[in-house]
Amino acid sequence: PLQRPHPPIVVTAVAPFSKGIVEAAARGWDPISANFLLRKWVKTHWPKYVEGCERAGRPADPANWRVARSIFVADDMNTARDYVFDANSPYRFYYSQLLTKMKKHGRANLFKHDQNMHDDDVTLEMVMDECITWGTPDKVADDILALRDEVGDFGTLLVAGKDWADVALSRRSM
């Protein structure tokens, strides 16, 4: 960046054990872990960020790590489940498109807990179950705390936006 000091530069990390995070952190940039990664892969980003910060001689601060997730909140579980998993759901559309593209380009590994799993065994339902946080406010809060427990401390939770099939429900979710 030509401007000194420059605004914060934040890069998206989409791969498990991302080498891009190492390089970004070494340049003084900070990571966003993509919303479509399994938690086990999100967790691999912190050590890579630390590695890059150490290379640059700067402290690794969890406050600089952003984690993106797909989140939908409703007043009751049935409404949340229907909105997220319905055939016309923007969440289903997003993850269906993403899974189709990743499989086509040999990247279905992003959705696998076990890398020996066959690509055909990676289903849309499995990906949605793993990647979407949904439910009542209490359930979603508990799931976010569980995310933090699993992946470690991070600074900012980013909600990955989806199209609004129902404006009132989408606005309420925010």
Language-model-detected regions and their locations in the chain:
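Active-site-proximal loop/turn and secondary-structure-junction residues that shape catalytic pockets
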Residues: A15, L37, I71-V73, D163
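Catalytic domains of carbohydrate-active enzymes, especially glycoside hydrolases
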Residues: E23-P31, R148-V151
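Glycine-rich, proline-tolerant flexible connector loops at the mouths of alpha/beta enzymes
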Residues: F36-R39, L158-L169
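Internal, glycine-rich beta/alpha segment that forms the wall or movable "lid"
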Residues: P1-R27, K40-P47, E54-R55
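Short glycine/threonine-rich loop-to-helix capping motif typified by GTGT followed
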Residues: D76-T79, A165-M174
